[in-house]
Amino acid sequence: MRNGEVTTINGAWNEESNAWVSEIWCLTGDCWLEITLPDKGRLVIKKAETLDGPWPKAKITTWTGPEFRIRIYGSTKYRYVRIYLTEEPVRIQFANTKGYAVRSL
């Protein structure tokens, strides 16, 4: 994989957490995760964590419509984040400093 690319995302509904759980792996640089929901309902991120525990630096920016952006800062250890959402997304897109990759669930 080339420098700056974003790897695939995994996601599934987790009954124990009562949340949609997604794992994001970003190889290098700052990364953004954009989430689109099935309707214009409110997205709630129940928690975000890294391999070392809670990730308090998750910055959420609301866009127009049902889209949300989460920035994964370059200081995030291992460039890995697991997020817990209150709704299952219909689309997840990635952007980073080296390009754009799209994954559909």
Regions inferred by a protein language model and the residue ranges of each:
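Short proline/glycine-enriched turn/loop motifs at strand-loop junctions of beta-rich domains
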Residues: 37-43, 86-89
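Secondary-structure transition/turn motif
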Residues: 24, 48-49, 86-87
